[in-house]
């Protein structure tokens, strides 16, 4: 609500027009607290002429605040007396009502204002392309050769990528930001080794979009793997499978973050992905945890029985790598094997 907005007892057209014409002086005076004043029809003040048509004798004003900020002004009028007595008597009730109004509407106004700022910020990121695609190698654990790369997004202001994408989704710009990031990643990936596949993070909403998404991927001749995290909800598995099938044989599917929660198990069973990516929570401290090792052995058995391949994520130590090799996990990814870097530095990332 703009400073100076009037909430009146009755929504007469003159008062509605007045609410749009109140001077900045009211907002300045509101900082001092509630007040009552007789109405004076001052020549040369258009809003005075408007209120004079209503016939007030005095007005009472109460600031509406939220979080110690002025967000509006509540006004009542008196037409029953020539002096200020009647209006002055009503002032405590007006102040109480203004406090209640601030508590009721202030939080929503603050939320809307913040959402507006976030929307503008995300729009600015998209229009300025204020992000950079980086690529992390996916490595064969036996032989240490990079066979694929996952495209990730880094923002030029250093913002956390997950937070930015979540904010974009919250203000209705999730698909726009996601599409812009994918376009940048596909363009940059053209200089990667031709034999390497490319993993792209894509939301179910974008994949199910159909033709727009197929057009987006259509310019790439590289083998693509679409990753969907276990944290997202797939509302319609039938529609998702149909959308994936329409992308053709050169586009496969991976379930990301397997082991981080229950949703990944249903994703795996319903979608039969080509790859299952083991979450860092299964890999961390693996060398000293029999339960984690048993879980990975079970997933390895499932992968072999269903024809998918495991990728262990978040490999950070030699001990973790050694156990994963011993457990015959075929593929891995993590800082030990290569950090996410711009495309020009990918040849130097694999240990």
Model segments located where?
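Regulatory loop-to-helix N-cap segments in sensory/regulatory domains
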Residues: 77-94, 158-159, 285
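Signal-transmission/dimerization alpha-helices at domain junctions
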Residues: 67, 93-112, 167-171
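Catalytic core of bacterial c-di-GMP phosphodiesterases, primarily the EAL and HD-GYP domains
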Residues: 174-242, 314
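EAL-family c-di-GMP phosphodiesterase catalytic domain
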Residues: 5, 204, 223, 227-235, ...
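A short, aliphatic-rich beta-strand micro-motif
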Residues: 57-65, 134-135
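Regulatory sensory and allosteric helical modules in signal-transduction proteins
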Residues: 3-52
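Sensory-domain boundary capping and coupling elements
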Residues: 64-79
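Active-site core of bacterial EAL-family cyclic-dinucleotide phosphodiesterase domains
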Residues: 115-167, 333, 338-342
């Amino acid at each position: 609500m703009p400073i100076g907005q009037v909430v009146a007892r009755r929504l007469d057209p003159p008062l509605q027009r007045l609410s749009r014409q109140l001077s900045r002086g009211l907002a300045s005076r509101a900082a001092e607290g509630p007040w009552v004043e007789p109405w004076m029809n001052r020549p040369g003040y258009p809003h005075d002429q408007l209120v004079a048509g209503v016939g007030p004798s005095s007005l009472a004003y109460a600031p509406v605040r939220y979080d110690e900020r002025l967000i509006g002004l509540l006004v009542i009028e008196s037409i029953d007396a020539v002096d200020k007595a009647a209006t002055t008597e009503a002032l405590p009730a007006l102040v109480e009502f203004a406090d209640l109004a601030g508590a009721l509407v202030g939080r929503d106004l603050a939320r809307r204002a913040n959402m507006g700022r976030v929307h503008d910020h995300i729009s600015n990121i998209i229009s300025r392309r204020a992000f950079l695609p980086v690529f992390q190698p996916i490595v064969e654990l036996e032989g240490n050769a990079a066979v694929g790369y996952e495209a990730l997004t880094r923002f030029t202001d250093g913002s956390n990528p997950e937070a930015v994408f979540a904010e974009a989704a919250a203000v209705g710009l999730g698909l726009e930001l996601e599409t812009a990031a994918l376009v940048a990643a596909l363009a940059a990936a053209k200089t990667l080794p031709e034999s390497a596949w490319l993993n792209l993070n894509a939301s179910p909403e974008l994949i199910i979009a159909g033709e727009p998404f197929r057009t987006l991927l259509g310019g790439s001749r590289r083998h693509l793997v679409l990753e969907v995290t276990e944290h997202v909800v797939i509302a319609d598995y039938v529609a998702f499978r149909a959308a994936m099938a329409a992308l053709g044989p050169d586009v496969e599917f991976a379930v990301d973050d397997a082991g981080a929660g229950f949703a990944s198990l249903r994703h795996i069973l319903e979608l039969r992905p080509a790859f299952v990516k083991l979450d860092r929570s299964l890999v961390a401290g693996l060398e000293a945890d029999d339960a984690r090792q048993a879980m990975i052995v079970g997933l390895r058995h499932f992968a072999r029985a269903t024809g998918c391949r495991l990728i262990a994520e978040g490999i950070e130590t030699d001990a973790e790598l050694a156990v994963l090799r011993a457990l015959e996990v075929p593929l891995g990814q993590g800082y030990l094997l290569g950090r996410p870097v711009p495309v020009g530095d990918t040849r130097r990332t694999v240990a």
